[in-house]
């Protein structure tokens, strides 16, 4: 049922539904830092966890690593560094008491290249080194949707890559919110009235492999991984998790699942 109806949830609602399902099955949520595994005879037997300033060893029969943007760090702790990159992406929430972004609108996407600054604005900004790459023709992809008493604007036209982010929450550049807002002007010109309004900006990392296929499958005996879902994590997570669970339990898996196995980076063929 959860898989069939996953599209009816937002990201937070989906997370809460999964947490409630875990608790209903007797699972519990424990906070800590994953430090690696302890091995006996070459096999991983327990996870090393730091909790409340103490390091603990948690024995397991099967360990699944699904740490989202923490995946590069978790793989390094395991001694399995794989060729991953992390792209910081940001979203901006703008208050919209006048309803300039229609409340009944679906997710809107502008799928054409665009220039987000007028010629007179570009003349004023061309000496700003950080803004210079944004002054020309930018790729498509600006999107937004209503949320609460405002709307979310998302546009990362020139994403950068980080090989080893130190955390899960990148710091947004000061202009991230305005860039996202300007990206929606072709769709909703009335949003120009919100220039100068201070948005709430946050973000995270899109972790990806070189060919932009996820990691799903065994890393070593007893250790499995699910991650590098790029920018489609919420959409793909439940189907991917279902496939990984079936595989780990020795059940039949979809033919496509094995194409995502992390061993592809170790197989010369």
Give the ranges of each region predicted by the language model:
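Active-site catalytic microenvironments for nucleophilic, acid-base chemistry
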Residues: 21-25, 70, 77, 243, ...
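Mid-domain beta-loop-alpha active-site segment that forms a flexible
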Residues: 1-21, 68-70, 176-183, 229, ...
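Hydrophobic/aromatic beta-strand patches that form the interior of the parallel beta-sheet core
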Residues: 30, 64, 214, 224-226
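Internal, well-ordered alpha-helical segments in soluble enzyme and binding-protein domains
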Residues: 10, 14-18, 33, 43, ...
């Amino acid at each position: 049922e959860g898989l069939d109806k996953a599209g009816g949830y937002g990201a937070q609602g989906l997370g809460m539904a999964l947490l409630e399902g875990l608790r209903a099955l007797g699972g519990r949520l424990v906070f800590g830092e994953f430090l690696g595994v302890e091995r006996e005879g070459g096999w991983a037997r327990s996870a090393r966890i730091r909790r409340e300033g103490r390091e603990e060893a948690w024995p397991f029969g099967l360990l699944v690593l699904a740490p989202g943007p923490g995946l590069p760090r978790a793989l390094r702790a395991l001694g399995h560094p794989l060729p991953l990159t992390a792209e910081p992406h940001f979203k901006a929430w703008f208050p919209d008491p006048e309803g300039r972004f229609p409340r009944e609108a679906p997710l809107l996407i502008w799928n054409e290249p665009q220039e987000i600054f007028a010629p007179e604005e570009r003349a004023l900004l061309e000496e700003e080194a950080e803004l210079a790459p944004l002054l020309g023709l930018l790729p498509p992809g600006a999107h937004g949707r209503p949320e609460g008493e405002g709307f979310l604007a998302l546009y990362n036209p020139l994403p950068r890559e980080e090989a080893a982010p130190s955390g899960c929450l990148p710091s947004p550049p000061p202009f991230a919110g305005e860039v996202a807002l300007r990206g929606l002007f072709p769709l909703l010109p009335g949003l120009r009235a919100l220039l100068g309004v201070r948005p709430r900006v946050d973000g995270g990392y899109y972790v990806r492999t070189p060919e932009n296929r996820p990691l799903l499958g065994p890393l070593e005996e007893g250790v499995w991984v699910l991650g590098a879902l790029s920018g489609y994590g919420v959409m793909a997570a439940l189907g991917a998790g279902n496939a990984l669970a079936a595989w780990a339990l020795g059940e039949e898996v979809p033919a496509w699942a094995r194409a995502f196995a992390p061993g592809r980076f170790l197989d010369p063929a």
